[in-house]
Amino acid sequence: MSIEERVKKIIVEQLGVKEDDVKPEASFIEDLGADSLDTVELVMALEEEFDIEIPDEEAEKITTVQSAIDYVQNNQ
């Protein structure tokens, strides 16, 4: 499974959204209905899945599906 597919799978599981709604430009809060706690849990799930550390200042910048994919790809 590609990084993109794994990130999308985590988003679907964490936010309880349909896979069809997880588009690259989708904002976690505005488009996918996440709140700030959801986004923290999402970052924690990404850290666990990809065995990476995401500092708070970087986590704040991860606001869309594509930004999550890009971050993981650049920090693997």
From Swiss-Prot:
One of its GO terms (molecular function) is acyl carrier activity. 4'-phosphopantetheine is transferred from CoA to a specific serine of apo-ACP by AcpS. This modification is essential for activity because fatty acids are bound in thioester linkage to the sulfhydryl of the prosthetic group. GO terms for biological process: lipid A biosynthetic process. Gene3D superfamilies: ACP-like (1.10.1200.10). Pathway: Lipid metabolism; fatty acid biosynthesis. Residues 1-76 form the Carrier domain. One of its GO terms (cellular component) is membrane. Belongs to the acyl carrier protein (ACP) family. PANTHER family: ACYL CARRIER PROTEIN, CARRIER DOMAIN-CONTAINING PROTEIN. This is Acyl carrier protein.
